[in-house]
Amino acid sequence: MSYGKQFNTLLNHLSEGVIIVSEDFDILFANEIAIKYFGNKIIDIPIYNVIRNSELIDAINENRSIDTMFLYNSSIGKHILELSYHHKKNNLGILIIRDKTIEEKFQNVRKDLIANVSHELRSPLTTISGFIETLQNEEIDPNQRAKFLGIMKEESNRMDRIISDLLSLSKIEINMYAELDEKINLIDQIKTAKDALDLRADELGKSINIRYPDYDTPNISADSDQIIEVFHNLIDNAIKYSHENSAIDILVELIERQDRSYLKSSVINVGTPISEEHLPRLTERFYRVDKARSRNVGGTGLGLAIVKHILLRHNAELEITSDIDGKTTFSIFFPVDNN
């Protein structure tokens, strides 16, 4: 293989896009990554007809190097690209293209999370701060004092729940790619979660029923603690948002789907219908359909986000449906090893 072909092969194996520009501003070479973004017909085309970025074009015209960001809409989607142009003494220019789309999205998610956490904690802190000022008045009625202290305790508990759920979510993300080396019986884990919530459901006049096959279902590779947490969150939600004196049904069945076996587990409750536009967003952090009601029942807005991340780790799918009668179903599909 000639040196030139070896060099081209090397450039084509880079994770960044590379474009070489002539002194006449024409594109002499583009590696495979650059072609993926800008198409395979860019050779011999002026660079300013391919990348319409004024900062880059000014730098090329003035024979100077530059680093700039570029939002590009291509046939494969919208991309945030970092453009690093280097002018060489032989009047050639080398443009390095790095895709920052995922990194920028991550940064935006991080910023949104910080903003949401700040907002969620500011509200109870403001309430507590206001009552502290009121309680500093020595002439306040004892009954009022007791009432205010009760509210302060509840707001403090709310902050504790938010922080606890955030720590839980962080732990799940840290262990996202850790090996799942347990073989567990799914029904046993669901029963454990159910048993922990039976008393609370009973106190609210509700019941939790579970149905499963009368034969031994296959075990799945999983983290048993996380699976219990998934069903604890789903059953807890069903208790919170179902009608008074209603039943929460849990159904486990072995199904075939797309030529593979799955253990399908559904948590079903009847309450206020959830509009279709809300369903895809229910697993977002701090997303609530009814913010006031969620806070009143002790929701943090993080329970379903925790469920989502645990299921991602387990390569399991979550489907959520809600009909006009208020029957809401959370169905999870756990893949079963067919071997």
PLM features per residue range, with description:
Residues R200-R211:
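Short conserved segments within the C-terminal catalytic ATPase subdomain
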Residues P46-I102:
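PAS-family sensory/regulatory modules and their coupling/dimerization elements
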